[in-house]
């Protein structure tokens, strides 16, 4: 598996003055002064091409499920192991898109989706599918995060903005914690310390800045709001921070990035290199990656000191993609940017 960073990227980097710790042509390192994010080639694509899918990882596999393809809504699931070998498990029980996914125990859970589905599908370490109790309210454009022994599914849209939260434990038993402080959809969620955070979203005709935090006992608190209200964005955890990046501020696209530490203190970071919405995020090593967006191939990386760098872009500009981490790789799969995409880009630390 070779490492690629094209001549055009090298030229652009030098012309812009971007510091490069390592540049690679093929697999030949030209410079090497420390850990660097690189994108690997020849990852087997998804089957089929699609957008509006969801992804999460548990155990030794990252799973990409659901979405909308050229032939319609799909139930397809693709699994990638730590060596980036792809297998195709049993599909979702119901085809759907704009669903979400989270891990708990040995399971990856896919929940919700259009059109206002309440279905939850769970895949164990052997990729066997079971169908636990459905969500309390069917909805799409919801968000999910793991905290302690629970996977939480919050918000969404089901004819109206939803504040519902469903929690599944490691035995796939569902309970219903306190609802979000306001109903909203197209929100984002991530975990930091002892908290799962649900931030932003679209509430009525306004871009929300609200953040709700759930601890391991599923008690809800309300930390400082996002610096900018926005929706159709993404969140990711790295080291001691949960980062919320990009989005739509009900008109202009946003490049804002907010970081919450384990005490729920918020700081505002160097913004993304390009304002964009409907992007995806994943972490690898000590880097949080924000990739793609409408319509961009850009990737922004934030390390544990919250310093931003700009690694090689995705292989193609696309949005409504999904991302997950497995082994030493952060994977960005699917999306649309003209044609629907089956591409999977993998980032690792060299």
Predicted segments, located by residue:
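Kelch-like beta-propeller repeat domains
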Residues: 2-5, 11-13, 21, 25-350
């Amino acid at each position: 598996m070779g490492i690629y960073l094209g001549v055009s990227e090298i030229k652009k980097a030098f012309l812009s003055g971007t510091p490069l710790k390592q540049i690679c042509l093929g697999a030949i390192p030209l410079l090497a002064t420390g850990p660097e994010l690189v994108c690997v080639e020849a990852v087997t694509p998804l089957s089929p091409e699609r957008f509006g899918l969801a992804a999460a990882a548990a155990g030794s596999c990252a799973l990409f499920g659901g979405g909308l393809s050229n032939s319609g809504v799909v139930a397809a699931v693709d699994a990638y192991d730590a060596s980036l070998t792809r297998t195709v498990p049993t599909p979702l029980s119901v085809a759907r898109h704009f669903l979400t996914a989270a891990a708990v125990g040995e399971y990856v859970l896919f929940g919700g989706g259009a059109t206002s589905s309440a279905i939850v599908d769970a895949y164990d370490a052997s990729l066997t599918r079971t169908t636990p109790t459905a969500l309390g309210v069917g909805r799409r454009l919801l968000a999910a995060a793991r905290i302690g022994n629970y996977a939480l599914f919050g918000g969404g849209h089901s004819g109206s903005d939803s504040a519902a939260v469903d929690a599944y434990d490691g035995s796939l038993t569902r309970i219903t914690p306190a609802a979000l402080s306001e109903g909203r959809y197209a929100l984002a969620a991530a975990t930091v310390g002892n908290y799962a955070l649900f931030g932003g979203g679209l509430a009525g005709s306004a871009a929300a800045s609200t953040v709700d935090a759930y601890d391991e006992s599923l008690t809800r608190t309300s930390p400082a709001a996002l610096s900018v209200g926005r929706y159709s964005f993404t969140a990711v955890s790295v080291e001691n921070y949960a980062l919320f990046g990009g989005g739509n501020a009900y008109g202009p696209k946003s490049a804002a990035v907010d970081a919450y530490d384990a005490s729920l203190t918020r700081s505002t970071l160097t913004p993304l290199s390009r304002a964009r919405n409907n992007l995806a995020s994943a972490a690898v090593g000590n880097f949080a990656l924000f990739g793609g967006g409408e319509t961009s191939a850009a990737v922004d990386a934030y390390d544990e000191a919250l310093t931003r760098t700009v690694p090689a872009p995705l292989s193609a500009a696309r949005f409504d993609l999904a991302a997950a981490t497995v082994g030493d790789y952060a994977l960005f799969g699917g999306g649309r940017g003209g044609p629907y995409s089956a591409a999977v880009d993998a980032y690792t630390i060299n």
